[in-house]
Amino acid sequence: MTELIDGKALAQKMQQELAAKVNNLKQKKGIVPGLAVILVGDDPASQVYVRNKERAALTVGFKSETVRLSEFICQEELIAVIERYNADNTIHGILVQLPLPNHINDKKIILAIDPKKDVDGFHPMNTGHLWSGRPLMVPCTPSGIMELLREYNVNLEGKHAVIIGRSNIVGKPMAQLLLDKNATVTLTHSRTRQLEEVCRCADVLIVAIGQGHFITKQYIKEGAIVIDVGMNRDDNGKLIGDVAFDEVAEVAAKITPVPGGVGPMTIAMLLEQTYQSALRSTHK
């Protein structure tokens, strides 16, 4: 019988532990970790994500600021908001909610964030730290997945890990983190041939393609570990993953649900990285 990898439970445990650490930092150093979230436009999904992050930050005792900006804001004005938070010593983490409107260059916005406060881990300087084996700020979804694998005693050394999706947010950093644990990694994408055959070789399969129930049990080797990063809506508005959960659970040894798997861990790692940034600020 398959084991459920419960990201919600682990995230709650981590947040309880983090709340104690935040209180200790406040008592000993007089520092409260500060997180600034910048939302441009009124995309419904982005609004939900931002509210969840704000709620979680307040729950663990952070200072939380959310800036909601018009979708018509110009790039220079957005950068000015970021620079204000770069200079604010009470803010230790800055997050610009993606996606941004088409007239704004994502790369320039990411470059505008102080790498020490880039809790999303997207700045090229943080990417370089990750690639060189000295990670500082790591994209939150891949780091959350690594925590899940550790918590559920998944030994990655020598295992074949297949990742579906090569984005800078999940796929590429995920590959590096797995390599650092001595896994053998295959990174697949929309041009990969014989994808089903490649997936059936995976000891660990990580799916991040944004297509609801794309992965069926035909893609899964008996006893594999399946991590579903997808968040999609079906025709009835129900939240579903990229993996057809019920049938894949028949063959997988361990599997994450959607919701309640990877999503809560992404927020947990965002909070942890903000706390670590605040902690580093005490050593200046």
From Swiss-Prot:
Q: Where does NADP(+) bind?
A: G165, R166, S167, S190
The reply to whether Protein transport figures as a keyword in the UniProt entry is: no
Give the pathway listed in the UniProt entry for this protein.
Answer: One-carbon metabolism; tetrahydrofolate interconversion
Output the GO biological process annotations, alphabetical, semicolon-separated. L-histidine biosynthetic process; methionine biosynthetic process; purine nucleotide biosynthetic process; tetrahydrofolate interconversion
EC number(s) per entry: 1.5.1.5, 3.5.4.9
Q: Which UniProt keywords apply?
A: Amino-acid biosynthesis, Histidine biosynthesis, Hydrolase, Methionine biosynthesis, Multifunctional enzyme, NADP, One-carbon metabolism, Oxidoreductase, Purine biosynthesis
Q: Which PROSITE patterns match?
A: THF_DHG_CYH_1 (PS00766), THF_DHG_CYH_2 (PS00767)
Question: Per its UniProt record, what InterPro entries does this chain match?
Answer: Aminoacid_DH-like_N_sf, NAD(P)-bd_dom_sf, THF_DH/CycHdrlase, THF_DH/CycHdrlase_cat_dom, THF_DH/CycHdrlase_CS, THF_DH/CycHdrlase_NAD-bd_dom
Gene Ontology annotations for the cellular component aspect, listed alphabetically: cytosol
SUPFAM superfamilies named in the record: Aminoacid dehydrogenase-like, N-terminal domain, NAD(P)-binding Rossmann-fold domains
Question: Entry's NCBIfam families?
Answer: PRK10792.1, PRK14179.1, PRK14186.1, PRK14188.1
- HAMAP family according to UniProt: THF_DHG_CYH (MF_01576)
Q: Which family does it belong to?
A: Belongs to the tetrahydrofolate dehydrogenase/cyclohydrolase family.
Q: What is this protein called?
A: Bifunctional protein FolD
Source species: Streptococcus pyogenes serotype M5 (strain Manfredo)
